[in-house]
Swiss-Prot record:
GO biological process: pronephric nephron development; protein targeting to ER; protein transport
Protein name: Protein transport protein Sec61 subunit alpha
Transmembrane segments: 34-53, 77-96, 118-138, 145-165, 173-193, 241-261, 289-309, 355-375, 421-441, 446-462
Subcellular localization, as worded in the UniProt entry: Endoplasmic reticulum membrane
Lumenal side: 54-76, 139-144, 194-240, 310-354, 442-445
Family according to the record: Belongs to the SecY/SEC61-alpha family.
Function: Component of SEC61 channel-forming translocon complex that mediates transport of signal peptide-containing precursor polypeptides across the endoplasmic reticulum (ER). Forms a ribosome receptor and a gated pore in the ER membrane, both functions required for cotranslational translocation of nascent polypeptides. May cooperate with auxiliary protein SEC62, SEC63 and HSPA5/BiP to enable post-translational transport of small presecretory proteins.
Gene symbol of the encoding locus: sec61a
Membrane topology: Multi-pass membrane protein
InterPro entries membership: SecY/SEC61-alpha, SecY_CS, SecY_dom_sf, Translocon_Sec61/SecY_plug_dom
Upper taxonomic lineage: Eukaryota, Metazoa, Chordata, Craniata, Vertebrata
Native source organism of the sequence: Hemitripterus americanus
Quaternary assembly: The SEC61 channel-forming translocon complex consists of channel-forming core components SEC61A1, SEC61B and SEC61G and different auxiliary components such as SEC62 and SEC63. The SEC61 channel associates with the multi-pass translocon (MPT) complex.
Ranges of the Cytoplasmic topological domain: 2-33, 97-117, 166-172, 262-288, 376-420, 463-476
C-alpha cells in the first residue's frame, strides 16, 4: 500500500518546481554566498507587507509561535516555515505508522521528498485560506473576493519561495538547511531586540523601554530610588527583564554542554588491517527535529482551535479544544489560551505560573517529554539514520564494529541508536521545559532551536576547515 501511494503521487511530483542537484562540487565560498543570498531573500520577505490587508492590529493568536516558525505578522512571511514543517510532520507520522512505506532505494526517498513538497504546497494554500477567512486581515465580506484571493496568492507564492530556498540549501548549494537558518536568524533577532529595543511601551508604571538592558539604564537614570529601580530592571512584569536575559544565557550554556555528550563506537576497516576509527552516537542523535515537529503540531492545533473559536464561540467541544483571550499589556496585541486542551499544551509564562497552576505545568511537562521522545524515535526510521541504515552505510564503507561480526552489527547498533534517539528527545523536551519555567527570552523551544542550529553551523565550519586547511583558505 505504501509504495502504491508513492507511485500514485509520482505524476504530481514530476511537475513540481525543483532545484537541480549541482553537477560539480560547490566551493565553500560559493556556499557562503548562496547561504547569504537565501537569508537576504528571507529577511526581505519578512519586511514586505501583504498587499490588500485592511487591518492586522487584532490580537495575534500565533504570537507565541512566531519566533519558532520564523514568521512575521502581516508580511509575506506570515506563514513562515509552518507549511514545510507541517508536511514533514504528516509524512513522518504516516511513514512511522506504516500507513505508507518508504524503501531504502534512492527512488523511494526521492518520491517521499516529492510527496513532502506536494503536501507543503497544499498546506500553504489551506493555511492561507484559513488565515484570510477567519478575519486576521479584516472582515472577508468587506474586503471582497478579489482582495481575499490576492492575499491567498501572495501567501502561496511566499510559501513556495520558502520551500525552494530550503531545497536550494539542502541540495548542497549552501550550508545547512533553510528551515534551520530561518529559525536561528529569527530567534537571535528576537533575543537581541528584547535586550536592546529602543521602543517605548506605556505601562501602568509609566513609559518604559522594551529592551531589558536599555530599560535598566533608563530606570537607574530617572528613578530616585536606585535600589527599587535596580529591582524593577531585574524583575519587571510583562516586559523583558534582566532575569530573562540571564536565564537565556544560562540555557545557552547548558545546551552547549549537553551537545558534547556522545558514545564513540569502535570500528575498523574490513579491508585494511590496523585501520581503526570511531562512530559517534550523540546524545542529541536527532538534533532539533523533535522540537521542530512538536512546535508544528502545537501551532496547527492553535490554528484549528482559533478558527473554530471564531466561528463557533460557546460550543462545548470547541471550548474543550481551547478558549482564548486577548492581551494588550507589555507589547503587541496577542491572543493566548486560557482554558481547554490548548491551554494545557502551552508553556507556563513563568515559575510563578507553575506554582499557581501545578496541574497545567504537570500536563505540559508530560506532553513535551513524551512528544519529543516519540518524534525523535520515529524520525530515525524515515530519515535514513536507524540502526539498519547506519549498518548499511558502514558496510558500504567496508567498516565493521570491533569485536562483532558484520552480521551482528544491526543488533549491536540497535542497543544504542533507538535509546539515544528516545533519550535525546526526552532531554530536548526537558531542557525546553526548564527554559520556559526560567522565563528565557524567545521561549524554551526557541532557545533550544537556536543553540542546536548554531552548533550545527559551527560543526559545518569545522568540517569545511579541516577539508580545506584553514579558515583563511575558506574565505579568501
Amino acid at each position: 500500500m505504501g509504495i502504491k501511494f508513492l507511485e500514485v503521487i509520482k505524476p504530481f511530483c514530476a511537475v513540481l518546481p525543483e532545484i537541480q542537484k549541482p553537477e560539480r562540487k560547490i566551493q565553500f565560498r560559493e556556499k557562503v554566498l548562496w547561504t547569504a543570498i537565501t537569508l537576504f531573500i528571507f529577511l526581505v520577505c519578512c519586511q514586505i507587507p501583504l498587499f490588500g490587508i485592511m487591518s492586522s492590529d487584532s490580537a495575534d493568536p500565533f504570537y507565541w509561535m512566531r519566533v519558532i516558525l520564523a514568521s512575521n505578522r502581516g508580511t509575506l512571511m506570515e506563514l513562515g516555515i509552518s507549511p514545510i514543517v507541517t508536511s514533514g510532520l504528516i509524512m513522518q507520522l504516516l511513514a512511522g505508522a506504516k500507513i505508507i512505506g518508504v524503501g531504502d532505494t534512492p527512488k523511494d526517498r526521492a518520491l517521499f521528498n516529492g510527496a513532502q513538497k506536494l503536501f507543503g504546497m497544499i498546506i500553504t494554500i489551506g493555511q492561507a485560506i484559513v488565515y484570510v477567512m477567519t478575519g486576521m486581515y479584516g472582515d472577508p465580506s468587506e474586503m471582497g473576493a478579489g482582495i481575499c484571493l490576492l492575499i491567498i496568492i501572495q501567501l502561496f507564492v511566499a510559501g513556495l519561495i520558502v520551500l525552494l530556498l530550503d531545497e536550494l540549501l539542502q541540495k548542497g548549494y549552501g550550508l545547512g538547511s533553510g528551515i534551520s537558518l530561518f529559525i536561528a536568524t529569527n530567534i537571535c533577532e528576537t533575543i537581541v531586540w528584547k535586550a536592546f529595543s529602543p521602543t517605548t511601551v506605556n505601562t501602568g508604571r509609566g513609559t518604559e523601554f522594551e529592551g531589558a538592558i536599555i530599560a535598566l539604564f533608563h530606570l537607574l537614570a530617572t528613578r530616585t530610588d536606585k535600589v527599587r529601580a535596580l529591582r524593577e530592571g531585574f524583575y519587571r512584569q510583562n516586559l523583558p527583564n534582566l532575569m530573562n536575559l540571564i536565564a537565556t544565557v544560562f540555557v545557552f550554556a547548558v545546551v552547549i554542554y549537553f551537545q558534547g555528550f556522545r558514545v564513540d563506537l569502535p570500528i575498523k576497516s574490513a579491508r585494511y588491517r590496523g585501520q581503526y576509527n570511531t562512530y559517534p552516537i550523540k546524545l542529541f542523535y536527532t538534533s532539533n527535529i523533535p522540537i521542530i515537529l512538536q512546535s508544528a503540531l502545537v501551532s496547527n492545533l492553535y490554528v484549528i482551535s482559533q478558527m473554530l473559536s471564531t466561528r463557533f464561540s460557546g460550543n462545548f467541544l470547541v471550548n474543550l479544544l481551547g478558549t482564548w483571550s486577548d492581551a494588550t499589556s507589555g507589547g503587541p496585541a496577542r491572543a493566548y489560551p486560557v482554558a481547554g486542551l490548548c491551554y494545557y499544551l502551552s508553556p507556563p509564562e513563568s515559575f510563578g505560573s507553575v506554582l499557581d497552576d501545578p496541574v497545567h505545568a504537570g500536563i505540559y511537562i508530560v506532553f513535551m517529554l513524551g512528544s519529543c521522545a516519540f518524534f525523535s524515535k520515529t524520525w530515525i526510521e524515515v530519515s535514513g539514520s536507524s540502526a539498519k541504515d547506519v549498518a548499511k552505510q558502514l558496510k558500504e564503507q567496508q567498516m565493521v564494529m570491533r569485536g562483532h561480526r558484520e552480521t551482528s552489527m544491526v543488533h549491536e547498533l540497535n542497543r544504542y541508536i533507538p535509546t539515544a534517539a528516545a533519550f535525546g528527545g526526552l532531554c530536548i523536551g526537558g531542557l525546553s521545559v526548564m527554559a520556559d519555567f526560567l522565563g528565557a527570552i524567545g521561549s524554551g523551544t526557541g532557545i533550544l532551536l537556536a543553540v542546536t542550529i548554531i552548533y550545527q553551523y559551527f560543526e559545518i565550519f569545522v568540517k569545511e576547515q579541516s577539508e580545506v586547511g584553514s579558515m583563511g583558505a575558506l574565505l579568501f
